[in-house]
A protein has these predicted regions:
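Short, flexible/disordered intra-domain loops and linkers
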Residues: 29-34, 60-73
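Short loop/turn segments at strand-loop or loop-helix junctions that form parts
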Residues: 22, 55-58
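Short active-site-proximal "capping" loops at secondary-structure junctions
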Residues: 57-62, 95-96
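Active-site regions of metal-assisted phosphoester/phosphodiester hydrolases
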Residues: 1-51, 82-83, 87-258
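Extracytoplasmic small-molecule ligand-binding "clamshell" domains
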Residues: 75-76, 80
Length: 258
């Protein structure tokens, strides 16, 4: 790297970025009574974070498109990205006759590459790890992994080991952000992921993971933000209106210092 290029990199380097992670419940309220994806998009846009980690987002659903008048003509993740997040990646986890759903990542930074890792254990629950490499200005690579793990503890433990295997293949000095719905109500993930260098933002700041489910009366700590080679600040659980009525999970918002 030439001195001029180095100076340019230092001037334009990004040292902080904001993220949001939310299980969208496929765009419906808790008991599937209303389709509220347009309202969710408005709320997410107001925060204007650099990264958005989405779980349970539809790529397509033919019968819903016929039933709900506000159903978008594009995949849900594209509808949510709109003009705010020019880059997005989608990892299809479940496919059925009417359509599909999975994880998605919205980014204000270029996505250099992405891959969806199938971590389903058996045929009952389709789960995935959506891994993306981001072109964030600075001296280190930034990797993001959007996670949705299974409902059974022994499935989750196997999936956490698969996540650690994925992370072991990344550059040792890369900044790594892992966020999503871990379904880890028994709080077993922290110890497993500490072995591969991750720390959980809310646990480090407050001594315990954030309670995020159900959104209206959060009792269970299902959602997480884990980091490696970077630090989390201003960690918040968004439990007030409108968030408490936009999904069955309360979103988590964090500022990451690279």
């Amino acid at each position: 790297m030439s001195p001029e290029t180095l100076r340019h990199s230092q001037r334009s380097a990004v040292h902080r970025l904001r993220l949001l992670t939310v299980n969208t419940h496929k765009g419906f309220t808790f008991f599937n009574r209303r389709f509220i994806l347009p309202e969710l998009r408005d709320a997410v846009r107001i925060l204007s974070t650099e990264l958005v980690f989405l779980q349970e987002v539809h790529g397509a659903h033919q019968s819903h498109a016929l039933r709900w008048k506000d159903w978008p003509p594009t995949p849900q993740y594209e509808f949510l990205a709109d003009s705010m997040w020019p880059e997005f990646a989608y990892g299809r986890n479940a496919v059925y006759p009417d359509g599909d759903h999975g994880n998605a990542l919205l980014s204000k930074f270029p996505i250099l590459a992405f891959h969806n890792h199938d971590v389903a254990i058996g045929d009952h629950e389709m789960r995935g790890l959506l891994h993306a490499e981001l072109d964030v200005p600075g001296e280190r690579a930034v990797h993001a992994v959007c996670v949705h793990l299974g409902l059974q503890e022994h499935h989750r433990q196997k999936q956490l080991r698969l996540l650690c295997r994925l992370l072991s293949g990344l550059p040792v000095d890369a900044a790594v952000i892992v966020a999503g719905d871990f379904n880890d109500w028994r709080c077993k993930a922290d110890a497993t992921l500490a072995e591969c260098g991750l720390h959980e933002v809310f646990t480090r700041a407050h001594g315990a993971p954030a309670k995020s489910f159900p959104a209206r009366w959060p009792l269970l700590p299902l959602d997480r933000v884990y980091l490696r080679n970077c630090s989390g600040h201003e960690a918040r659980v968004l439990t007030r209106r409108p968030w408490s009525h936009l999904s069955d999970h309360a979103p988590l918002a964090v500022e990451v210092h690279l």
